[in-house]
């Protein structure tokens, strides 16, 4: 048997169709409230504006 024939037999049908399998055991990501992201971006903009006022580019 050619090696390509063996490889095709080992590949799941869903993978051959282009579908992705998601496993239940995935690493948890950090969960951040959207309000914290908004506050952090406003603070960052304020810091950048303040620094450009103090030290002109």
From Swiss-Prot:
Specify the protein's topology with respect to the membrane. Answer: Single-pass membrane protein
BP terms from Gene Ontology: protein transport
Q: Does the keyword Membrane apply?
A: yes
Give the Extracellular membrane side ranges.
56-57
Tell where it localizes: Cell membrane
Tell me the keywords, alphabetical order. Cell membrane, Membrane, Protein transport, Translocation, Transmembrane, Transmembrane helix, Transport
Query: Residues on the Cytoplasmic side?
Result: 1-33
From the record, give the transmembrane residue ranges: 34-55
What's the main place this protein lives?
membrane
Q: Which InterPro entries match?
A: Preprot_translocase_SecG (IPR023531), SecG/Sec61-beta/Sbh (IPR016482)
Q: Name one GO cellular component term.
A: plasma membrane
Briefly state the protein's biological role. Answer: Involved in protein export. The function of the beta subunit is unknown, but it may be involved in stabilization of the trimeric complex.
Quaternary structure, per UniProt, is: Component of the protein translocase complex. Heterotrimer consisting of alpha (SecY), beta (SecG) and gamma (SecE) subunits. Can form oligomers of the heterotrimer.
- HAMAP family, A to Z: SecG
What the record says about family reads: Belongs to the SEC61-beta family.
Name the record gives this protein: Preprotein translocase subunit SecG
Q: Which organism is it from?
A: Metallosphaera sedula (strain ATCC 51363 / DSM 5348 / JCM 9185 / NBRC 15509 / TH2)
Give the gene symbol: secG
């Amino acid at each position: 048997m050619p090696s390509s024939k063996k490889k095709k037999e080992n590949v799941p049908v869903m993978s051959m169709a282009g579908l992705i399998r998601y496993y239940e055991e995935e690493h948890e990501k950090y969960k951040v409230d959207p309000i914290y992201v908004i506050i952090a971006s406003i603070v960052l903009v304020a810091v950048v504006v303040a620094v450009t006022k103090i030290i002109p580019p």
